[in-house]
Amino acid sequence: TEPGETIVKGPAPDAVTPEVLMDNLRRAMRDRDKDLYESVLDPSFWFTETDCAGDLVLANGFEQEIEFLGGSRDGSREGIFDIFREFEYDFQLIQEYIELGPDYPEAFEGDPDGHPEEDWQVFRGRVQMLMLDENGDGFRVDQIMTYKLRLADNGLWKIVRWIDDPLSGDCGAGKRLTKRYNWSNVKLTANR
């Protein structure tokens, strides 16, 4: 493409495979597309991030996730997609596997990790994000993340769990050489 040339994209394809879903996630993030982002999430979506001690940093469900990224449904609050003019997102696959349902019984009623009746496709990898506002200020995220996908009743794949690993620099006694943010920190800071 030539400088200044506009690229017109067609609608995102239906997530009929886990790979298409992951491509749609990438596209939703890079294009800051609220509707596409919502379409990749399962209604029972659950996000968690813990620190190195295993303590919960952040946990949120579907509606709060939509508000974090897309803003409030009534338009009274901006989301991350509104705040930043540039959003780079890259996922580098480390491991792909299937969680067999019988191996994941519900530990308690409503357990977001229990899925004894269905198998989930899992993508674990390194995610790098760069978010910049109109002043060039923003956040850089470089973190290991795990996405767990389920096949919905309509035949489309959806993200049902998103689990962020603690930042490796937070686990040891060493000092970080650069300022990096975990995804939970960005979600909470940008939505103040």
Annotated model-derived regions:
Residues 41-44, 51, 125-127, 163:
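A mature extracytoplasmic/lumenal domain signature
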Residues 57-139:
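Surface-exposed, charged secondary-structure patches
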